[in-house]
Amino acid sequence: MGTWILFACLVGAAFAMPLPPHPGHPGYINFSYENSHSQAINVDRIALVLTPLKWYQSMIRPPYSSYGYEPMGGWLHHQIIPVVSQQHPLTHTLQSHHHIPVVPAQQPRVPQQAMMPVPGQQSMTPTQHHQPNLPLPAQQPFQPQPVQPLPHQPMQPQPPVQPMQPLLPQPPLPPMFPMRPLPPILPDLHLEAWPATDKTKRE
């Protein structure tokens, strides 16, 4: 009877408490500490003995292996990098679609963008001497292109500004709720009628 209880306790402890991996067998309980005779057991026999544990642990996946910090960190880093790269195209698409509020913002932004490479060019002057032809043609076509659409954009935003103005007259729709004065009138009538009905009912 006592041996069965001891065996049940050992089995329960084997399933309940995860032990750190031993050098002989990774991640599973090594019974060589229990008996002196089992110290001579080969790793293959231990694997055969521990196959139920392997099956049980494969059924119940440990949270540390499946929810490790490395995949989450890698996932976050992978998400951050595309977001940063997508912000620039998104700003350009927003600027192209919404000309009205962005046109005043574009004009100051373009000089700022032009000012940002200037310090970079001054600091990178030694590298530009090595490759003077490659960066200059790449930067010059990009700068005239935003400058040329800017004079055209003030011509285009004027029609979209007019659709924005009709949106402002649309808020007169909320004034269509002058029904609010009517509810106070009805409760006043009811308040006057309620005390009379209550008094008659009480009498």
From Swiss-Prot:
Question: Which residues fall in a compositionally biased region of kind Pro residues?
Answer: 143-180
- MF (Gene Ontology): structural constituent of tooth enamel
This one is known as Amelogenin, Y isoform
**Segment forming the signal sequence:** 1-16
UniProt keyword Repeat present: yes
Which residues fall in a compositionally biased region of kind Low complexity?
131-142
As for subcellular location, the record says: Secreted, Extracellular space, Extracellular matrix
Which purpose does this protein serve, as stated in its record? Plays a role in biomineralization. Seems to regulate the formation of crystallites during the secretory stage of tooth enamel development. Thought to play a major role in the structural organization and mineralization of developing enamel.
**What PANTHER family would the database entry show?**
AMELOGENIN, Y ISOFORM (PTHR46794:SF6)
* The organism's place on the tree of life at top rank: Eukaryota
Q: What taxonomic classification does the UniProt entry list for its organism? A: Eukaryota, Metazoa, Chordata, Craniata, Vertebrata
